[in-house]
Amino acid sequence: MSREHNNSFREISMKIGVPKEIKPQEKRVALTPTGVAELVGRGHNVLIEKDAGVGSGITDSDYIAVGAVISDTAERVWEESEMIIKVKEPIREEYPRMREGQILFTYLHLAADEPQTQALLERKVIGIAYETVQGDDGSLPLLTPMSEVAGRLSVQAGCHCLEAVNGGRGLLLAGVPGVRPARVTIIGGGVSGINAAHLAAGMGARVTILDVSADRMRYLEDIFHARVDTLMSSAANIRQCLSESELVIGAVL
């Protein structure tokens, strides 16, 4: 890159802040040191709240080494940053820290959170939701990885719930020799549903996927090679699957 281009980046540099996630059980951090290095290399200033990366195994020293500045408080991060990058949506405690014109880049999931929507409107924040960012081909590159994780984790959680010690029926998803495996129904054949099916079928469960698209079901048949069954999603088929299944996973966006 030419010196002229480097200068142009610095002229439009931004102050980017990464506060520590405070939603219960959330251990992730929005930027890794690699991401910080990329932003700093383009002339941006990155402010990271102290210990923001600890839950992900990243130390303050790791961030400092690539050019970030560490803030002792979340208030400073929110106050000094033109753009805030988070993992999860802001919670009520964070609403007062948002200010007019500030860019908030994170998962927002506004459809299920009217109070947050109202707070963003009242604070006049520029909210960019990860889950709505689209590629040129209509794909959702920031939502897809989370859907992959959710799909696989749903099977893991289902196995846990099926254990007798957790109030379940005492079933092993894969079964054992002489005992049939559990029947798993997955409603929705998108990214999350496919990943759930991969794990459940790989463990030996009998898997059925329901979807409303015939083209999607043909695609599922192609990738699973008869390892799962597919059904058109209808009220009757859903009722039948619910009555026969030990584990049902909802995977509809």
Placement of each model-derived feature along the sequence:
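Short gly/ser/thr-rich secondary-structure transition/capping motifs
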Residues: A65-S71, K86-K88, A164-G170, V228-S234
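Residue-level detector of structured alpha->beta connecting loops
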Residues: S81-E82, K124, H225, E246
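Short, hinge-like loop/turn segments at secondary-structure boundaries
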Residues: Y63-G67, T144-E148, H225-D229
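Short, Lys/Arg-enriched N-terminal segments with co-localized hydrophobic residues
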Residues: R3-S13
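An N-terminal-biased, well-structured beta-alpha scaffold segment characteristic
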Residues: I12-S13, V18-A119, R123
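Glycine/serine-rich phosphate-binding loop and adjoining beta1-alpha1 elements at the start
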Residues: K15, E21, P90-R183
